Amino acid sequence: MYAIEITVQGTVASDVETKVTESGRSLSKFRLAANERVQDRQTGEWKDLPTTWLSVTCWGRLADHVTQSLVKGTPVVVQGRLRERRYDREVSGVSVPGSSLDLTARVVGPDLNKGVAQFRRTKSPAVRRAEERALAEAGFASAAAQPFVPDSS
């Protein structure tokens, strides 16, 4: 089976659910509503086409950053691997086939066509540890390791 890589503009349509797997890896999920607008050439009116719904899954640092950055209603651009998941569900005692579009995200960002954002770079745990080691070797303790002592003057 070949992977389908896509880029989708849409709106976060659910709260972001966050979990940590048994192996300690972060996982976040949210629903994405993608709406396409087209202009009627004869009337000039804009019309919304039916909404395409996707379930988006993010892993690792991306999952951590999505959890900290996105809320329901945020316009986003998501790039990743698309798969159709088929399932059966019971409706009034009858098994009914269904399907879902699942997108495993590689990149998620704000849709700057819809607003502005301010980017804040994060440091990886390895970089933070290296900086703390360098400070310790230079005779400085990290601020987190130093107890707070109020000024007595």
Where are these regions (language model features)?
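Beta-rich strand-turn-strand
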Residues: W59-V91
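Well-ordered beta-strand positions in beta-sheet-rich domains
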Residues: K29, T51-S55, R86, S100-D102, ...
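OB-fold/S1-family single-stranded nucleic acid-binding modules
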Residues: R83, R89-G115
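Core FKBP-type peptidyl-prolyl cis-trans isomerase
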Residues: Y2, I6-T51, V91, S95, ...
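OB-fold and OB-like beta-barrel modules that bind single-stranded nucleic acids
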Residues: V8-A13, L32, K72-E84, A105
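Acidic, gly/ser/pro-rich intrinsically disordered tails
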Residues: M1-Y2, V20-S23, T43, P110-S153
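Generic beta-structure capping elements
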Residues: L32-R37, R81, R106-V108, R120-T122
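A beta-strand/beta-hairpin structural motif
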Residues: Q42-Q68
